[in-house]
């Protein structure tokens, strides 16, 4: 029997975790729903969680609370201690200088909290914002706390793919900076097998790379559970399509819409979202006057669930060579609603891998985009295996169940905390998670 340590309390305090991220509830786009749900789930599992994040701004790129600035707001949300820090919100999100100011402003804003870094047993930082990662690295250098890096997107690759950075020297510099910050972390995790392989090629200290997929957040799951199961329901004529989420350069959604517009395919396409290219889509739909297209704002969860229930296909587009780290996560809500997925992407991308593995619907390369209208005509005529896609979506949804993923994350976090960041202890403790 282990003897109690001198001065040890009969009831140990909960492990204290700091999560650093740019978006948090009420922001749902850009991973906000998942980041928030992880904090809530870890609180449920006995962690004392503090979240340092920006004021709500995404994907609209506007100060949604009216509080963004130099002030720090502190409050509790479902047991998590939330701290809001100011950030420069770009008016032109695809301009490189504005993106650099966006990243740098968040880093400087967060650095004000650095003296309180000793309060935590471990830090988890989410990337795509390198500014967040830079702060977490500074915290590690000062306080020597174990650092977990969760890579949702490779920022340098995303900047290149979206046209934010076009100069090869600038792109190389961004990748070098990204690699240096990444390799200060003790353990990495990411959201798809393709991303695991990419990260293993970037690591310099043999850090564990944990495959930890995202999941359907709890509140969205409850909204979908209120609706009847639509598995087995035949597609409509016209075929109902839904796109919902961020609308930026990486999606290349306008190109997809233009291809459908030039055809006489039988479809109705609802598009709901916001982001750097949303106004472009809205204006294009208004200009064309094509009644098959309908544009609306980012949907609240109840409305999103209803739209998923109504649609035949949930559409996900991913610009060629975009990396697409985030994109497979967009499929999770569609899978959970038992909707067939219509994807347009590179076959070797994370989304392409997901579509091959789960087969929840058709996957078109951009070079085969012209085949989509004829495909929709066949669907309307009952000539495609639509019920099988629905069944596959339902089967795959179980893989993204909230409880099992957060349980795995909580167990891995306890290993990280107990290891104190020791590389050998981390590799041994997380061997079954890689």
Task: Name each region found by the language model.
Residues 251, 300-307, 312-335, 341-353:
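Nucleotide-sugar-dependent
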Residues 111, 131-134, 138-142, 168-188:
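Membrane-proximal helix-turn-helix segments that form the acceptor-binding/catalytic region
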